[in-house]
Amino acid sequence: MVSIFYANRLSYSIWNTIPGKYIREELEQNGVTYNELIKYWDITDPSQALPKVNKDNVLLISAKHDQYIDLKDADYLWESWGRPTRYVYNCGHSGIVLCRKKLANDTLSFIREKLV
């Protein structure tokens, strides 16, 4: 399984990222607190369970400067899943296009290693 810029807790992204600030403002205007949002969206939190796939067959790819998927939240999922193979690229969310060759090569290498 290869996951690129995996999101973990949607509540975290809304509350703690620049792109989520307008959603956060609207939620706060309607009396929703961060703790309530966590509770409401708890069912969508992938860090609550391990994947069915063996962790040796999981590759997570993050961007160091991603403003949509905060690295702290990506770290949280990575830790929760037992630290499977992970690559952190020195780019932002949209900047991945500048790393596409490296991304493709890294992903193909990971898959090839698993096929041997």
UniProtKB/Swiss-Prot annotation:
SUPFAM superfamilies, sorted: alpha/beta-Hydrolases
Recorded phenotype for the gene knockout or disruption: No BsuMI restriction or methylation-related phenotype.
Stored InterPro entries: AB_hydrolase_fold
Domain of life: Bacteria
Protein name as catalogued: Uncharacterized protein YdjC
